[in-house]
């Protein structure tokens, strides 16, 4: 596959209907070197897609087509309006409220919602330029899921003779000769039933996207290609972002006719001249011509303007508690060692003095008793008194 340096080549080969190079070359249009901005593409795609919506709303009578009145207070039930009558399950049930079965929804939808979105023309063109630039990068095309392993070149340009095709079998043969039929087989393999309610709304089957054929003049080409699954047909003068970047993701596989490919410079211009077919439009330019930041920052011009790096390492000092660390305390207070030594000696002297102190015969102070001990002693004293009283009674 000759696509590794495709987007960097100044010339693109034109291929014949037999899938071989015709010998002609086309200059790579400048739009394929435009900045690729997925954020702008996604934003524009989201807003343009909203313009296809059909207004919808619930009926303004929904949930109110019954006779109901609140029972008021005093019945130990909620004050929600209740259906009148009897003899049926419906009578007495809550009505009207959004919390009731059969009631209206909260904030019923209206048809005068703001459905459409306006997008700046320049921003739309920027998104189209980004989508076209991404279609020239094989890595982005393959990441989108397109099967382009065997095609001869990216972007793929064919002769203008293709625009006069009128039969589908001619279009199928061309795709097979260009080795692009694998992408169509991928579409066939992806055909499946839609999940969800869309099956009931005439949207039963879904499938993947195939190649996008971009032409200059329709001399029967649309009828030849339109019945092939996954194929999208676009006129180069009416490029649509919703088709170039399905889902808001860049990297659509595009097949160009020669005249359409040559017309891109007139449509979008180059960085040296503005577009001929668009009024006052210039191709968006890259913010950086060289994206190698390492090379830029280490260049001599920038290094000369920078000051020398400050390599002094300032380490945080570990703070220690001087009340627990004697060495730190001595650094703060050199007398601390002497004071501590005096305190220890004084303590030793006090201990020795207590040991040498003679007993002067004075009664030692008794240790105060706790409540439990007091109660035990009091009980013993009462028992002793009772025994003495009993002995005295016996002697009498």
From Swiss-Prot:
The record's section on InterPro entries has: Ribos_uL4_C_dom, Ribosomal_uL4, Ribosomal_uL4_dom_sf, Ribosomal_uL4_euk/arc_CS, Ribosomal_uL4_euk/arch
Query: Where is the stretch described as Disordered?
Result: 352-374
Q: Does the keyword Ribonucleoprotein apply?
A: yes
List, alphabetically, the Gene3D superfamilies matched.
3.40.1370.10
Cell compartments where the protein resides? Cytoplasm
The superkingdom listed in its UniProt entry is: Eukaryota
A molecular function (GO) term: structural constituent of ribosome
Similarity section: Belongs to the universal ribosomal protein uL4 family.
- Write out the function statement from the record: Component of the large ribosomal subunit. The ribosome is a large ribonucleoprotein complex responsible for the synthesis of proteins in the cell.
Descriptive protein name: Large ribosomal subunit protein uL4A
Q: Which organism is it from?
A: Xenopus laevis (African clawed frog)
